[in-house]
């Protein structure tokens, strides 16, 4: 998939210990990587506004704000959703939520294609794995297939999102060509074995991957109003507590306030 030259996107992911941002305009892409984790809540809004300024792209000119909705760090997901809500409300643009494990799969496929390890038009199944802490792993499998007569392909879910002990993960029926994520150093041999001829590669849900996925998701009508920017939890902790909801509201207000201040500057 390639980023559409007809769309203007802002993308960010804060689901891991890395804060990833990107902006796309007219075929040009700006990317930035910053420390995530606890620093994401204070660093995301200034980084977004600075990147949009560098790209000479007003927030209101965006087609959508693309963000990683989870699974991942609870704090990181709340930050991403709150900032996406606040900026989208302030600029009157929709949001485009993307599963972080799909972004991992796309980043891994893209990286391996660029390295020459996988042919650009090769169909493959990717098992995406992210460290969920607490001795567990988030996982999902996706199948990428080329579109006949086109230069891009499509992703299909081969195995739904799950969380559990590494040795108890369900495997898709398709042959997994590529395992990707950040769980290998922590769990090693406890993870499913790599199929003969398969590969393992480190990959994170980057904002650049979100951009590459955005056009297809947009075409499927998956953009939603700002208030529907909600985190995806797949542990038992599926509902925000009152404190968490208040924290998200506060961050959303902060994002709208920052946007208003930026707009008021000469």
Please identify what each model-predicted range represents.
Residues 2-71, 266:
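N-terminal beta-alpha supersecondary unit
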Residues 3, 39, 94-206, 259-265:
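Surface "functional belts" at beta-alpha junctions
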Residues 16, 134, 239:
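Short, glycine/acidic-enriched loop or turn micro-motifs at the edges of active sites
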Residues 35-43, 74, 78, 82, ...:
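Residues at secondary-structure transition points
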Residues 51-55, 90, 108-111, 210-218, ...:
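Stable alpha-helical structural segments in soluble proteins, enriched in small hydrophobic residues
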Residues 66-94, 100:
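DPxDG-like acidic metal-binding loop motif
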Residues 198-266:
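Acyltransferase
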């Amino acid at each position: 998939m390639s980023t559409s030259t007809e769309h203007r996107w802002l993308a960010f992911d804060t689901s891991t210990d890395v804060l990833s941002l990107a902006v796309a305009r007219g075929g040009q892409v700006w990317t930035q990587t910053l420390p995530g984790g606890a620093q994401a809540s204070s660093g995301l809004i200034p980084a977004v506004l600075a990147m949009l300024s560098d790209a000479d792209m007003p927030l209101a000119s965006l087609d959508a704000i693309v963000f990683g909705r989870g699974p991942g760090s609870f704090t990181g997901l709340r930050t991403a959703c709150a900032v996406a809500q606040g900026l989208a409300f302030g600029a009157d643009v929709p949001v485009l939520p993307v599963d972080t494990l799909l972004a991992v799969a796309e980043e891994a496929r893209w990286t391996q294609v660029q390295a020459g390890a996988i042919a650009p038009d090769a169909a493959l199944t990717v098992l995406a794995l992210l460290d969920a802490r607490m001795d567990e792993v988030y996982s999902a499998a996706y199948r990428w297939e080329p579109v006949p007569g086109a230069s891009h392909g499509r992703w299909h879910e081969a195995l739904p999102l799950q969380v559990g002990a590494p040795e108890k993960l369900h495997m898709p029926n398709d042959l997994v060509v590529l395992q990707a994520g950040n769980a290998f150093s922590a769990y090693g041999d406890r993870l499913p074995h790599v199929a003969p001829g398969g590969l393992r590669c480190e990959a994170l849900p980057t904002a650049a991957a979100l951009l590459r996925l955005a056009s297809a998701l947009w075409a499927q009508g998956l953009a939603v109003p700002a208030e529907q920017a909600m985190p995806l939890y797949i542990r038992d902790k599926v509902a925000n507590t009152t404190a968490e909801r208040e924290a998200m509201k506060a961050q959303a207000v902060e994002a709208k306030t920052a946007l208003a201040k930026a707009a008021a500057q000469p």
